[in-house]
Amino acid sequence: MLMPKRTKYRKQMKGRNRGKSFRGANLAFGDIGIKAIEHGRIDSRQIESARIAMTRHIKRAGKVWIRVFPDKPLTAKPLETRMGKGKGGVEKWVMNIKPGRLIYEMAGIDEALAREALALAQSKLPFKTKIITSESENEIY
């Protein structure tokens, strides 16, 4: 699972997920990728399950880049616990996703096969996404 090696503070506040993503919005490594078109939150398990689905479909040909990293701790209190007594423990690591953010990139394989693999990965993600290529990259969200 993806998570930071160490952080300055164990727990963070929730914050707000607003606006569009300008950093990490363009293809930098591959020829085709998945771009988020709505706000959401992705955790390390979702990132990993989508990656596994893609790599199994392409039979380890080509290369896959993960463009997101879950660096925000999400806390939860145990079930049937009364209110109070402090904030719960860290349950999982997440990353807030804004529209326009690239999630995965691929290179070195046929575009039709890459589209099939990325469609499998899209079904594992908890927000709406679209497949972009280097030609369609300049389209707005």
UniProtKB/Swiss-Prot annotation:
Protein keywords: Ribonucleoprotein, Ribosomal protein, RNA-binding, rRNA-binding, tRNA-binding
Region (Disordered): 1-20
Pfam family, one: Ribosomal_L16
GO biological process: translation
SUPFAM superfamilies per record: Ribosomal protein L16p/L10e
Superkingdom of origin organism: Bacteria
GO CC, one annotated term: cytosolic large ribosomal subunit
Molecular function as annotated in GO: rRNA binding; structural constituent of ribosome; tRNA binding
Entry annotated with the keyword Ribosomal protein: yes
Gene3D superfamilies named among the record's database cross-references: Ribosomal protein L10e/L16
Quaternary state and interactors: Part of the 50S ribosomal subunit.
UniProt-listed PANTHER family: 50S/60S RIBOSOMAL PROTEIN L16, LARGE RIBOSOMAL SUBUNIT PROTEIN UL16M
NCBIfam families per record: rplP_bact
Similarity-based family: Belongs to the universal ribosomal protein uL16 family.
Role description: Binds 23S rRNA and is also seen to make contacts with the A and possibly P site tRNAs.
Protein name per Swiss-Prot or TrEMBL: Large ribosomal subunit protein uL16
Organism: Helicobacter hepaticus (strain ATCC 51449 / 3B1)
Organism placement in taxonomy: Bacteria, Pseudomonadati, Campylobacterota, Epsilonproteobacteria, Campylobacterales
